[in-house]
Amino acid sequence: MIAAWIYAGLCVVTATFQVALYLGAPWGRWTQGGRYPTVLPPRNRTLAIATALFMLALGASVLGAADGGTPVPGWIATGLTGAVFLGHVVSPSRFERALWSPVSAVMLGAALWAMLA
């Protein structure tokens, strides 16, 4: 369960970052490929809040699977986390790569640990 809680905690951290973007934090260079270096435009803010909700759902899926629930949502979350990790690794934004590649790598490791435990 420790790995699942690590994963879920990092999902909450990521969701909090996305909510801050939605509210106008000038951190655009750290997300969405760095296309908007400061405040995201309205359309992209909507994407940020959707991402926040998505991250919370991923965290809940892995927690549920680790607590004896059906494993399918947890494995889907793990696979999606792997895709997110790859997206961060190849991001054109060096800021996004530097911050989110290591975070998503830890998330992927924690999700795999939780699902294989």
Q: Each PLM stretch: what is its role?
A:
Residues G34-R35, G69-P73, F95-S104:
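Non-cytosolic membrane-interface motifs at loop->transmembrane helix junctions
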Residues I6-A20:
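N-terminal signal-anchor transmembrane alpha helix
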Residues M1-I6, A117:
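Feature marks short, highly hydrophobic, charge-poor N-terminal signal-anchor/signal peptide-like helices
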Residues G24-A48:
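Interfacial loop at the N-terminal end of multi-pass membrane proteins
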Residues R45-V62, G82, S104-A105:
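Core segments of transmembrane alpha-helices
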Residues G64-A65, A111-A117:
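Juxtamembrane boundary at the C-terminal end of a transmembrane helix
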Residues A57-H88:
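Mid-chain, well-packed structural core segment of small domains
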Residues A83-L99, M115-L116:
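Membrane-helix boundary connector in multi-pass membrane proteins
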